[in-house]
Amino acid sequence: MDIIFGRNRKEQLEPVRAKVTGKIPAWLQGTLLRNGPGMHTVGESRYNHWFDGLALLHSFTIRDGEVYYRSKYLRSDTYNTNIEANRIVVSEFGTMAYPDPCKNIFSKAFSYLSHTIPDFTDNCLINIMKCGEDFYATSETNYIRKINPQTLETLEKVDYRKYVAVNLATSHPHYDEAGNVLNMGTSIVEKGKTKYVIFKIPATVPEGKKQGKSPWKHTEVFCSIPSRSLLSPSYYHSFGVTENYVIFLEQPFRLDILKMATAYIRRMSWASCLAFHREEKTYIHIIDQRTRQPVQTKFYTDAMVVFHHVNAYEEDGCIVFDVIAYEDNSLYQLFYLANLNQDFKENSRLTSVPTLRRFAVPLHVDKNAEVGTNLIKVASTTATALKEEDGQVYCQPEFLYEGLELPRVNYAHNGKQYRYVFATGVQWSPIPTKIIKYDILTKSSLKWREDDCWPAEPLFVPAPGAKDEDDGVILSAIVSTDPQKLPFLLILDAKSFTELARASVDVDMHMDLHGLFITDMDWDTKKQAASEEQRDRASDCHGAPLT
């Protein structure tokens, strides 16, 4: 499967015009900006894990029925250092880099010492975050990189630690209606404590504060949750929010800090420091956004691994939240390149299929309720929350759908009651082969699939003046295992799930992870002018397929 995984992708620095078939809605004007691993070998050295690859940004600019594509590697410090050395010298999740073997013993000793408390990579390959008027490539370390979403140029590096004490942070923040960013990170053994930190980055400098300063300087800690283990905090990829609450799952998929601190000496990767403890519980933390305090009742469920929260909302004194959950951590194991490139079908079988699960958590627990009582009275779900003798509440989910990943919703309904989940379809392999629209109300689904095609995360873009939750389009970047089939941007009608258009590009496109759509309303006059220049340049791009 080297045609998809493991092969380095070429940049498309100049915009190329796509061949459009079908009709793109006239109202769809903007840029789909995506991120994912694109380079897996540097010189003679090779990354071990697909999530280690150097970040490759790419974009589809849609304007007046035409589509323009471009891609560029994120010029992170990691990228520049590796390219200059012509080998991998910066460690990643599944690949530990080592000193030049020609160095003397003192240089080697210093390198070991410096890796005891690692300075993580700035290879931000997972997602794109909007903060105020700026856009950032993100991963799960303390570093993010500001980018120019028009040219894909890499700008300054931002270290979260300058503004909030976190060593790790999610690449799936939430945004309120004012554009403020709410995110979570882990503070490892800070002043003798390990904790999960919820923090807010304002979209603009708050009123009354000195203007001209960066909004980052006004980042504030929203709430801190002590880790149940000082040296083994939970790994998490995302979290949930409602209008008034934050939902955090402290799952028994944990990072061993002592192993991480000695990984370099033991010649092991950081990935080896993660372990799933199936005999333990998953603790559900609920934080009130108004008081900034955790709800005191202790909620838990069975051991599981969650990478993606789907959505959450409040209903009849309960919090209802939906997640994609696994019974184990086999997903990460399958993305080792050795599994993806040799005997693919045999080596890429999950031992747990991802399922869409709905949980319900009561905000107020009746102290007089008998032990074993189901505290959930919401008619819309069969999820239960059972009161236990010690006052804890055991939550059991409703299983909604099997075989979903990379979920997205209409973001206007984020934190609110909603009906539709848009996701990729997977089964025993982690590789998506279809796009699915799941209707939570009717428990029905619609699907798009095409032979030899692997779709990326489907992103919903609402139509102007939309009245229904599914009024809009779905955008997904499609790559193919058939070398004769060009990659393309797929545009689906979100309501009927019929294909409206596709924009094929004769480029070396990679399989990406996450991203966002920037509407033309998000561009200022200067950016609009730059877009016109891009169109003029694309028309003269040699070798570009034209409509």
UniProtKB/Swiss-Prot annotation:
Chain coiled-coil ranges: none
Tissue-level expression reads: Highly expressed in retinal pigment epithelium. Also expressed in kidney, testis, liver, brain, small intestine and colon.
Keyword Iron appears in the UniProt entry: yes
Query: Per the annotation, which location comes first and is thus the protein's main one?
Result: cytoplasm
Region named Disordered: 528-547
Q: Where is the composition biased (Basic and acidic residues)?
A: 528-540
Q: Where in the cell is it found?
A: Cytoplasm, Cytosol
Q: Which GO terms describe its cellular component?
A: cytosol
What family, per the record? Belongs to the carotenoid oxygenase family.
Disease involvement: Hypercarotenemia and vitamin A deficiency, autosomal dominant: A disorder characterized by increased serum beta-carotene, decreased conversion of beta-carotene to vitamin A and decreased serum vitamin A.
Q: What is this protein called?
A: Beta,beta-carotene 15,15'-dioxygenase
Organism per entry? Homo sapiens
The organism that produces this protein has a lineage beginning with: Eukaryota, Metazoa, Chordata, Craniata, Vertebrata
